[in-house]
Design a protein with these regions (language model features):
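Activation segment signature within eukaryotic-like protein kinase domains
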Residues: 131-132
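Catalytic-loop of the protein kinase fold
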Residues: 143-159
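ATP-binding glycine-rich loop module of kinase domains
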Residues: 39-65
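Short beta-strand micro-motifs within the conserved protein kinase catalytic domain, predominantly
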Residues: 82-99
Length: 371
């Protein structure tokens, strides 16, 4: 950290191992993982500016090694910020070592900058879905190679030509085993509330952060862990809300890595949640009901279903076979309604056979005349 605490001066020229020279033009940002400067790469034999870049003095040698490694690993990917140079140099009478990462200058800023703009109110769902697919494509490659980013938040997701690019790999980790990536550095606001219960960083935690990012992109405001309970109130297609719900699920049918999350976001729209004829009888069927019914209360329907030989479940499970969906889904009563519908959509996507029937079909199955 000592190198990061010793600021570079405006006008100072630093030289990398390859001989490239960089002039410091001003400070951009500073935090716990390093200090960032706006800079210019100069010509070899003059002070002519060849390219405007970003210079980051890392907080530690470990952070520097990690970020340089990730830059090489993901070189050439449009969806990440390009690393153009990495080197260490010593300055001052005490020879303080600075660990430097040079990256492309992202002139359009970050998603965090968009959030700070009062005129920005988010993107249309189609655009959000497209950008998420691209980010998840990168995470699919990273997770398959044992790499986790660990700090996906609005200020670390940049824009280039209006498209998202993942940056700041300062605390990313490369591990050969799932237990090899300790849970040591993270931003609490973008982590599950029960994060202290986990000893190691799982790939699903990266997906959790992408789920929060999706909410930010849809609404134009910074979503943190405190906002997860409001996901079903988002103005977005049901399949996208379902994806976000499972991406941010602390347990249950969450997406374990980039591969699973990418597959889900591309296939949830094809899941048919419309009413079907369903089974010929409710006998031995495991039934979940959701919504506000005209025929009676859910307790009254429970009795009718059980009289018809069915088993009523309070939540969707591995053996659920029927979902009874009311014409009116009341989003103001409890949190179960959203969870049941989202869970059924995801389970159907994974291949579980669940019949979705409406109130009229239920009435016929229990021997009532529809209201």
């Amino acid at each position: 950290m000592a190198g990061a605490r010793q600021p570079l001066r405006v006008g100072q020229i630093i030289t990398g191992d390859t001989g490239h020279r960089y002039r410091i033009d001003g400070a951009l940002d500073g935090g716990g993982f390093g200090v960032v400067y706006r800079a210019a790469r100069l010509a070899q034999t003059s002070d002519r500016v060849v390219r405007h870049v970003c210079v980051k003095v890392c907080a530690s040698a470990a952070d520097w090694h990690g970020e340089a490694h990730m830059g090489n690993l993901l070189a050439g990917r449009r969806e990440v910020v390009e690393i153009v140079d990495a080197f260490a140099f010593g300055t001052g009478s005490r020879g303080v070592t600075r660990y430097v990462i040079v990256s492309e200058l992202m002139r359009e800023g970050t998603v965090g900058d968009l959030v700070d703009d009062p005129e920005w109110h988010g993107w249309p769902p189609a655009r959000v879905r497209r950008e998420l697919r691209d980010l998840l494509g990168v995470l699919k490659l990273m997770h398959a190679a044992g790499v986790t980013h660990r700090d996906i938040k609005p200020t670390n997701v940049f824009l280039r030509d209006g498209r998202l690019a993942l940056g700041d790999f300062g605390i990313a980790k490369h591990s050969l085993t799932p237990g090899g990536s300790s849970l040591d550095a993270y931003t609490p606001a973008y982590m599950p509330a029960d994060v202290d219960q986990y000893r190691h960083w799982g790939t699903w935690l990266d997906i959790y952060q992408v789920g929060l990012l999706a909410c930010t992109l849809l609404t134009g405001r910074d979503w943190t862990n405190d906002d997860v309970s409001r996901i079903r109130d988002l103005t977005a297609p049901d399949d996208l809300k379902c994806w976000i719900w499972h991406a941010t699920a602390a347990r249950g049918l969450r997406y374990v890595d980039g591969t699973a999350a990418l597959e889900a976001i591309g296939s949830l729209r094809a899941v048919d949640m419309g009413g079907t004829r369903g089974p010929a009888s409710l006998r031995d069927q495991r039934v979940v009901v959701t919504g506000r019914f005209e025929t009676g209360t859910q307790d009254e329907l429970r009795d009718l279903i059980e009289d018809a030989g069915g088993v009523v479940q309070s939540a969707v499970s591995d053996d659920t076979s029927v979902l009874v969906r009311a014409h009116q889904i009341d989003n103001t009563v409890g949190g179960f309604e959203g969870r049941k519908l989202f869970s059924v959509r995801e389970r159907k996507r994974r291949g579980q056979t669940i019949h979705v029937i409406d109130e009229h079909r239920l009435c016929r199955l229990v021997g009532l005349s529809p209201v």
